[in-house]
Curated annotation (Swiss-Prot):
Protein name per its UniProtKB record: NADH-ubiquinone oxidoreductase chain 4
Record-listed E.C. numbers: 7.1.1.2
Biological process per Gene Ontology, one example term: electron transport coupled proton transport
Compartment list: Mitochondrion membrane
Keyword Plastid found: no
Annotated gene: ND4
Positions of transmembrane segments: 24-44, 54-74
UniProt keyword Transmembrane present: yes
Gene Ontology CC: one annotated term: mitochondrial membrane
Top-level enzyme category: translocase
UniProt catalytic activity: a ubiquinone + NADH + 5 H(+)(in) = a ubiquinol + NAD(+) + 4 H(+)(out)
Role description: Core subunit of the mitochondrial membrane respiratory chain NADH dehydrogenase (Complex I) that is believed to belong to the minimal assembly required for catalysis. Complex I functions in the transfer of electrons from NADH to the respiratory chain. The immediate electron acceptor for the enzyme is believed to be ubiquinone.
Amino acid sequence: SVVAHMGIVLSGLMTLTMWGISGSYTLMIAHGLCSSGLFCLANISYERMGSRSLLINKGLLNFMPSLSLWWFLLCSSNM
């Protein structure tokens, strides 16, 4: 994910146009916010559930609905 994002940033910068530079800048900011948000959510899930196992952490939608919404929003915006 990081390599793909930075490849797109580099491609935009290499166009040397205003659209490319502003798009690269926007993508860098968005990537930084999304990635740090996903790491924050992973830490919150670990602190509340006490495990990193996906088998143990099933049913998070029922247990933490707002956190599940944030997972969806950040994952979809990180694509």
